[in-house]
Amino acid sequence: MPLLDSFKVDHTKMPAPAVRLAKTMTTPKGDEIAVFDLRFCRPNQEILSEKGIHTLEHLFAGFMREHLNGEGIEIIDISPMGCRTGFYMSLIGVPKNARVLEAWRRSMEDILTLKSEEEIPELNIYQCGTACMHSLKEAQEIARTVLDRGISIMDNEALKLQL
């Protein structure tokens, strides 16, 4: 089985919160696709709470689209990592890391402005597979931690595993 790109980086060296351009590819029609690693916490040292990451999944995708889409960039998907240390974001176009960082920072600020769980999009049994597993408080704690620590940009060369 081929080794996936995400397993070719040394997770012990990953800073967090941090942005990493994980992969780029070109479709047969010539569209550029980018995948970003948005690492919220240090692998094997911290983990995002299940309610917090689930609520972030509902909020983060919308706020990131508000702040990042445009000028040849369109988010395809933002999904939580199985290890619960961050999210992968797939896009049409390849924005600069600094632009992604700024959109992420602004999204965390947006999350802190919410007053109640009624403001969480698609939080109902018809649109969410586990509607009872949410916590705005935990999502806001994660957002506050990201802002307090500051977001950096990862260096792919420094993270490359010597296989």
Swiss-Prot record:
It comes from Wolinella succinogenes (strain ATCC 29543 / DSM 1740 / CCUG 13145 / JCM 31913 / LMG 7466 / NCTC 11488 / FDC 602W). Involved in the synthesis of autoinducer 2 (AI-2) which is secreted by bacteria and is used to communicate both the cell density and the metabolic potential of the environment. The regulation of gene expression in response to changes in cell density is called quorum sensing. Catalyzes the transformation of S-ribosylhomocysteine (RHC) to homocysteine (HC) and 4,5-dihydroxy-2,3-pentadione (DPD). Keywords: Autoinducer synthesis, Iron, Lyase, Metal-binding, Quorum sensing. This is S-ribosylhomocysteine lyase. It is an enzyme of class 4 (lyase). Its EC number is 4.4.1.21. Homodimer. Its cofactor is Fe cation. GO terms for biological process: quorum sensing.
